[in-house]
Amino acid sequence: MKYNLVVAGGGLSGVAAAVSAAREGLTVLLVEKSGCLGGAISNNLVYPFMPYWTKQKDGSDICKKYLSQGIFKEMKVRHDRYVDDCKDHEFNSEYLKIVLDDMTAEAGVDVLFHAVVYDVKTDNRKISSVEITAKAQKITIEADFFIDATGDGDLFYLAGCDYQLGRESDSLCQPMTTCFRMSGVDLDLFTEERPRLQELYKEKQAKGEITNPRENILVFFGVGEDVLHFNSTRVVMLDPTNPFDVSKAEVIARKQIHELIGFLKENSAAFNESALISVAVNIGVRESRKLKGVHILSGDELINCTRFEDSIALGNYDIDIHSPTGTGTSHRYFGDGEYYTIPYRSLLPKEYDNLLVAGRCISATHEAQASVRIMPICCCLGEAAGTAVSIAHNTNKNVHTVDTKALQKKLTENGAML
């Protein structure tokens, strides 16, 4: 079997990569390990969208400038037809699954679920084929181009590309987190009691009665009139690319969930009628392998709001680093009107001419990745990668010789904000 493009990973970056390339006439196979598209949204219960806009003055008014547009905007608009009064950061993951199915089908993308790439074949500076396993079958797929949108950089790792695991000083990664939701919560009472609960949480943590090292109880509203979304578990000092470590982390996080629910029910009447209604299928990974590509995006470049000539996406989410060793979360925020650009070169492996990387595993330092890892930005990176492959294919170029001005022109024509 042969395609023009194989995309590994069906999260937002992989979907955007596949759809953007297929819309330009390429034959595309999208390989996804689970049974649905959406990645962190579908399998890790990640919610909500972190801010993908900046605020700027328009005359005397303050208005939003949306930085993540293109396919991301299309996806959000299509989703919002199903959900009344949906705010910019909100979504219903179940409807998003349907939207992503529709978008890939309409573009003509072949989607292979329950499948993972486990080996690659290379020829000089090209990947010639990938070996996929699905339902106990081994499948060889040849392609002209490949995009790694796996999050963990599995494809570029198998191909032998240079990479950095976690932070540069000790290879420790940001913590893993399993999100969960509770219904039947008195949200008004919880909001009133939240400061007291937070202090009590810290007291019990200091006594060792709470084992979760996270410094606070992080929750989000907006998923239901009596539902709380928790992003509160924290598993540290384990390797997200080691299957035995990840298996350990899954159990630790579920234990933390049980512990936290007990604490809330015991100490707040807001949870008297509450019930656990959902736990993420898989633990969420903030950081793992990051490509060491043609350009390694740095934290300083983000802080300085660098404008790269080969910019293919924008961002201004804060540099949000959850301590890899335990308690604490650091933030470096951007001011109104401030944003940075992400260069095409950060999607380029040094080793191959027909491989691009999209999503949270692009070429970036620990600090820079802490900002670019959010889903709206990842979606834009995927669209840029898929569009670049379509240009390379249609002009007989490789990914390193793509005309970045032509790439930028095509992206803006398709609604991207550069």
Which residues does each PLM region occupy?
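Conserved N-terminal/central alpha/beta ligand/cofactor-binding core
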Residues: 20, 26-27, 32-119, 174
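Membrane-embedded transmembrane-helix bundle of lipid-linked glycan/lipid transferases
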Residues: 6-8, 17, 22, 125
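Conserved beta-strand-loop-beta-strand element in the redox core of flavoprotein oxidoreductases
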Residues: 121-140
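Beta1/beta-strand and adjacent pyrophosphate-binding region of the FAD-binding site
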Residues: 1-11
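Flavin (FAD/FMN)-binding glycine-rich loop and adjacent Rossmann-like elements that form
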Residues: 40, 71, 138-145, 149-418
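N-terminal Rossmann-fold NAD(P) dinucleotide-binding loop
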Residues: 14
